[in-house]
Amino acid sequence: MKWYKKIGLLGIVGLTSVLLAACNKSKASQSKEDKVTIEYFNQKKEMDATLKKIIKDFERENPKIHVKMTSVPDAGTVLKTRVLSGDVPDVINIYPQNMDFQEWSKAGYFYNMTGKAYLNHLKNHYANEYKVNQKVYSVPLTANVSGIYYNKTKFKELGLKVPETWDEFVKLVEEIKAKKETPFALAGTEGWTLNGYHQLSLISVTGSANAANKYLRFSQPNSIKTSDKILKEDMVRLNLLADDGNQQKNWKGASYNDALVAFANEKALMTPNGSWALPAIKQQDPKFEIGTFAFPGKKTGNGITVGAGDLALSISAKTKHLKEAEKFVKYMTTARAMQKYYDVDGSPVAVKGVREDKNSPLQPLTKLAFTDKHYVWLGQHWNSEDDFFTATTNYLMTKNAKGLADGLNAFFNPMKADVD
């Protein structure tokens, strides 16, 4: 072959290579440009590993969407700073019972999801529990529940029966003491641990969460009195924890962890707490079967639990990638996504089709979840909670009725500016 033909051929080959390389580079660049990144802000840090797996599954099904998960310490404070500075993540795990969520929804920070088809994937229209001005801004995928943990093995040994009514609960405590056992493990230094029990007491006495808040939050200032029938019945229920001999030794100085360790080490046969406590109890490797029961009502079948949305998702109203953000939220409302979550977390799942462990210690509470016996925390309509926790523990330590009434009035009075 003549040299100029060789040069011509080499030139064609070289040009072809350059064109192919440029074409491939262009395709790669175009592919990269086509891929959309959305940010998911997570507050369930203990579930990071599981959520990463779920996100990978989503990305596999949606190769043009990349989900960047943000999970930081003190997530609530970080989120507040970002929202108030206008830097709202595309998809946010935010607790819909919190006042921040409600105020930010009213202020237009979140996308209105009212009427979206994926809301039908939730049990009993659960998203409606957290409507703000009759609009849905949150998709609550899981919830927590609260009740009474008990030593199932010891109950069987001693012939003790799980109470179905309040009177049976009182009788049970007396039977436990008669058998030289301690009824309750309590955390006197951390009032939030008794929040569930006290709220369940008030809901049970008044008949509903709305009625309880009507008495506490939406009544006239200084209207809570020791002579009130409601407060008297509430104190009867608090006294079941407060009466001498009903708690483990040194309970007044006990922390949350101390109370769970006391229960796990069989220093007490019961402890009031929420679903979040189960992993911590199991970490103590108790040598007995753990059980739970709902807060007993006045009649059989009236047991109740209280809790709220836990893994709950909102979308920024100003996201630049609404289509992709909604696609991710929709995916999270599927059983294939939430089955993986439930298998690790164990909390009640609002998504239809998730197979629940019928042998879970939480099953007696889980079966009430997302029904009319699963109330949302009363604090959904409060602007704070800490002083309520304090009023509860102060009463348990002193059994001072006037102190409880005064403490509740002092806590709720500043919120009542909107009460006619």
Curated annotation (Swiss-Prot):
Entry superkingdom: Bacteria
GO biological process, one term: transmembrane transport
Location in or out of the cell: Cell membrane
InterPro entries tied to this protein: Bact_solute-bd_prot1, SBP, SBP_1_CS
Membrane topology according to the record: Lipid-anchor
Leader sequence segment: 1-22
Main localization category: membrane
Lipidation positions, renumbered (N-palmitoyl cysteine): 23
Function recorded in the entry: Involved in a binding protein-dependent transport system responsible for the uptake of melibiose, raffinose and isomaltotriose.
Protein name in the entry: Multiple sugar-binding protein
Source species: Streptococcus mutans serotype c (strain ATCC 700610 / UA159)
